From Swiss-Prot:
Gene3D superfamilies: Viral matrix protein, C-terminal domain, Viral matrix protein, N-terminal domain. One of its GO terms (biological process) is virion assembly. It holds the Pfam family Matrix_Paramyxo_N. Keywords: Viral envelope protein, Viral matrix protein, Virion. InterPro entries: Matrix_C, Matrix_N, Matrix_Paramyxo_C, Matrix_Paramyxo_N. It is found in: Virion. This is Matrix protein. Its main location: virion.
Length: 375
């Protein structure tokens, strides 16, 4: 059985926008009881290389409603029926070219027609049927997908509320647009993340998030209390990469060896909204050969939080957060080795103190640019 953990402390880097993911403010429409205003959230995350092409990630948040029933006769004065909200939902439109007009983006949402169905295989799934999307997003990933299948617990807040025999529609209310460098768009293939071998050691990453919530709120019961009294603390883990086991029997592969490897990689972590709330990791130094498949050619990798912790990701749909600290943990890769060895923790992961100073787009990070009624 593993013994105590070994920790290498480091003071926390300065605060910055790249550490935070702010929640959308709740703004009610003056007309229409209980009607939220549509809003757009804009942010830039750039690699620092002026030659790197810029793209936009568009992510949507909204609500699933039952499709309104149509009557036999409809007059000119008939009001559009709005059915009650069933549950909240998230759907990513994916990456595409840079979009220049925030107001146009909000108005274009009226042209969206996305149907929602529930199904199952080895677990519950949600099927999004893309009947129509705004022409503005024709070059984004969603335009190539007529059907999107996903795990229900990752994209729907309360999938248990969706029942058989009811037709559902997804209504977009919040639009999150991230202007980023094309080199940031990299995720590791799931089979590679899931593979375990006795020939390597696994490097995990723990990110501690300070989530904005009240101490007496329901979500606070599932998190740690913040010693600074500014919210609650949530821990989320990712499989970062693998390191080859050393074969030199005269060398000690301890925390000093691991710290040296991590220090040479020069790891930096930040947070953004790409495939939903997403942790971005950049290796700015030497990447060991065994670890290279886990990063792209420029040293970037993205880890959507919903892949590791769906419940935490759904909490962040409506709550802001910031990165409190990040650590890398060295473990045995196969379960037999994992059970017999201590975790070696490297706490010197830097939190990116600010976005790259590139002024290709004049949008300020997380500035609410425009809003309109959710009709």
């Amino acid at each position: 059985m593993a013994g105590s953990q070994i920790k290498i402390p480091l003071p926390k880097p300065p605060d910055s926008d790249s550490q935070r993911l702010n929640a959308f403010p709740v703004i009610m429409a003056q007309e229409g009881k209980g009607r939220l205003l549509r809003q757009i959230r804009l942010r830039k995350i750039l690699s620092g290389d002026p030659s790197d092409q810029q793209i936009t990630f568009v992510n949507t948040y909204g609500f699933i409603r039952a499709t309104p029933e149509t009557s036999e006769f409809i007059s000119e004065s008939s009001q559009q029926k709005v059915t009650p909200v069933v549950t909240a939902c998230m759907l990513s439109f994916g990456a595409g070219p840079v979009l220049e007009d925030p107001q146009h983006m909000l108005k274009a949402l009226d042209q969206t027609d996305i149907r929602v169905r529930k199904t199952a295989s080895d677990k519950e799934q949600i099927l999004f049927e893309i009947n129509r999307i705004p022409n503005l997003f024709r070059h984004h990933q969603i335009s190539a997908d007529h059907l999107i299948q996903a795990s229900s617990d990752k994209y729907v807040k309360s999938p248990a509320k969706l029942i058989a025999g009811v037709n559902y529609i997804y209504c977009v209310t919040f639009l999150s647009v991230t202007v980023c460098s094309a080199s940031l768009k990299f995720r590791v293939a799931r089979p590679l993340l899931a593979a375990r071998s006795r020939l390597v050691r696994a490097v995990q990453m723990e990110v501690l998030l300070r989530v904005t919530c009240k101490k007496d709120s329901q979500m606070a019961k599932s998190m740690l209390s913040d010693p600074d009294g500014e919210g609650c603390i949530a821990s989320v883990w990712f499989h970062l990469c693998n390191l080859c086991k050393g074969r030199n029997k005269l060398r000690s592969y301890d925390e000093n060896y691991f710290a040296s490897k991590c220090r040479k990689m020069n790891l930096t972590v930040s947070i953004g909204d790409m495939w939903g709330p997403t942790i971005l990791v950049h290796a700015g130094g030497h990447i060991p050969t065994t670890a290279k498949p886990f990063f792209n050619s420029r040293g970037w990798v993205c880890h959507p939080i919903h892949q590791s912790s769906p419940s935490l990701a759904k909490t962040l749909w409506s709550s802001g957060c910031e990165i409190k600290a990040a650590s890398a943990i060295l473990q045995g890769s196969d379960y037999a080795s994992l059970a017999k060895t201590d975790d070696i923790i490297y706490s010197k992961i830097k939190v990116d103190k600010d976005a790259a100073n590139y002024k290709g787009v004049s949008w300020s990070p997380f500035r609410k640019s425009a809003s309109m009624s959710n009709l």
